[in-house]
Amino acid sequence: MSQGSRAPFVVAHRGASAARPEHTLAAYELALQEGADGVECDVRLTRDGHLVCVHDRTVDRTSSGSGLVSEMTLEELRVLDFGADGSPASVLTLSELISLVLDWRSRPTKLFIETKHPVRYGALVENKLLAELQRFGIATPASADHSRAVVMSFAATAVWRIRRAAPLLPTVLLGESSRYLGGSAATTVGATAVGPSVKTLRDHPELVDKAAAAGRATYCWTVDDPGDVQLCADLGVSWIATNHPGRTKALLPAA
């Protein structure tokens, strides 16, 4: 592990999403039970201004309904089933997920929140997100290391908005281009970490050292193969997002 003495922290990608429907309360509860160090979610804004944990622009793939998240109210989303295999599940709001994470008393767990762009609401997504973090008292941590929330986006402007409004909140600039992540973009927007895909990291392992030299951590997604878990550990990746948090934790040495 070239960048530090400890193994990567394990982040449950959309919860324990290999075993439970993604972005459901059941998926996140299982991830926490399996010992995930962090949980990840994507957020989108409903027509009536609520942040919900949904990856796609539409609800077609993950629910019993169809349509754009941005054109539906929270009440309309609530009547859809986001579960599977006879276990119904309601849409999860960011507020509900934050409450779950903060109330989990066995250990502190970080929440990695990805804002999706381009969207019709633009900067309102980040504004609403910051308001929600402020409501829970986690928008202004004492330091980045002690932050309970990390904000991520593929959109550099979204990262910049967060850094400008809440400079102590850690941020991750996501991407699949080594040139983009290894260039000046992260510096320009003030990202505290870069987030390459595992494929990008396989092809360009030097990204980790390059980020570290600039004082940035590395967040790698989505790491499910045991060989890739070992690669991330060997390179010194800080955080790995996985659909299998329990299995991935078992592959790594204990902290």
Name the predicted role of every residue range.
Residues 1-255:
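Phosphate-group recognition and catalysis centered on beta-loop-alpha active-site segments
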